[in-house]
């Protein structure tokens, strides 16, 4: 399990899930009081210190608790997290929305991004090769999240709505070719994107010989990945399936 001990992995998983919920730096006292980790507060502190040294946690201020790094989130997603599948009723609702909108690429992507934003409570973006449009929905949702109280962070993220070239770079070039790709602003090197996380899905519109397209969500790095990864994956597969015979 990477270079982490089982105890370190357990502490890291607990800390990440608490951080996803609270949006606050996590201290050893919080973990000790709220969760039965079976070790002393001193041991938790020591393990958190070690996790910081090896790049899984970071401390924003000397007196504050710690938050996960992109490396920690990737380890969590790949080895610790259990996905929560989209309920059948939500799948059916999404399919109906996409099938009803399958009149044109514009209506399809417009309705799909809106539906994805509503389902994930995040900013949703979509793009299709050959189209000079970024479809988007849900920008008001991220403004309620603490990470976007910083006007510079919010402005730079929302500016993507108008930047087709940058969205294509993000979705087609930076994202891997897996069914779902996870991107962290911390890794992009773009100004003010450090607290940002993204989940995207690539697919073909119009079957294997059609056009490459991508849909995804943007939110804080602490996105509830166990929920949103299967949702984004489902939407990508759904659009590909619905348009296969177009």
Predicted segments — roles?
Residues 1-13:
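Short alpha-helical segments that sit at the start of domains
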Residues 3-4, 39, 68, 86:
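Alpha-helical hairpin
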Residues 4, 24, 146:
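Residue-level marker of regulatory loop/turn positions in helix-turn-helix DNA-binding domains and
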Residues 11, 69, 217:
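Conserved RecA-like P-loop NTPase ATPase core
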Residues 14-21, 25-80:
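N-terminal helix-turn-helix
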Residues 81-83, 87-246:
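Intrinsically disordered, acidic Ser/Thr/Pro-rich low-complexity regulatory segments
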């Amino acid at each position: 399990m990477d270079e982490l001990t089982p105890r370190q992995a357990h502490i890291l998983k607990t800390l990440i899930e608490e951080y996803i919920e609270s949006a606050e730096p996590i201290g050893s006292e919080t973990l000790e009081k709220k969760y039965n980790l079976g070790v002393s507060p001193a041991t938790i502190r020591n393990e958190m210190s070690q996790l910081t040294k090896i790049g899984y946690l970071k401390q924003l201020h000397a007196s504050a608790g710690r938050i996960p790094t992109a490396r920690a989130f990737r380890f969590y997603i790949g080895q610790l997290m259990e996905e929560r599948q989209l309920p059948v009723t939500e799948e059916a609702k999404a399919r109906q929305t996409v099938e009803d909108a399958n009149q044109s690429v514009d209506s399809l992507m417009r309705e799909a991004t809106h539906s994805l934003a509503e389902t994930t409570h995040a900013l949703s973006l979509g793009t299709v090769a050959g189209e000079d449009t970024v479809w988007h929905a849900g920008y008001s949702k991220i403004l309620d999240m603490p990470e976007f109280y910083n006007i510079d962070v919010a402005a730079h993220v929302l500016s993507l709505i108008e930047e087709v070239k940058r969205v294509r770079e993000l979705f087609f070039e930076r994202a891997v070719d897996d069914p779902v790709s996870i991107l962290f602003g911390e890794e992009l090197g773009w100004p003010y994107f450090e607290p940002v996380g993204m989940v995207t899905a690539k697919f073909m519109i119009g079957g294997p010989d059609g056009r490459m397209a991508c849909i995804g969500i943007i939110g804080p790095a602490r996105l509830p990945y166990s929920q949103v990864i299967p949702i984004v994956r489902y939407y990508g597969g759904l659009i590909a399936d619905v348009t296969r015979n177009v």
